[in-house]
Amino acid sequence: PQLILSLCWGFAVLIPWAAIEGNIKSVVLLFCWLATVFWTFGFDTVYALADKKFDLEIGVNSSAVHLASNTKFTVQICYLLTSVFLAFCALINQLNWIFWPIWLITAFLMQKDTLKIFPESKQSIREIGNHFKKQSIYGGFILLGFVISS
């Protein structure tokens, strides 16, 4: 389910771009789409941890179930790739220096927050919810960085 959601949310990048530009032929668009897909997969995998017990009971092969002991590593890689693809977008668009501290702090916090929900003994509904909420805040900071640095 998390992969499908990630691909669908990726259309939130593709559709407006196509409507404004009239095409989807852009390396920046590709990087934005990839950042969206990886970020969504990462944070929705964390969100799926809250339901992992129920997914196992009813046979749902969520990413939290499928990845098992590789979940932490996968989420960290997803967040790393998200940060890298966003950096490529910023470089290509020659954003000014204001973006980079925002990007660096956000990339660091995304990784740091992952440690708060692993190992599995730390996975309370509250911690998972906080992680999910913080991801939306980080997204807001990244957006702000793009806007004020353009």
Q: Which role does the model predict for each range below?
A:
Residues 1-150:
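Multi-pass alpha-helical membrane architecture of UbiA-family
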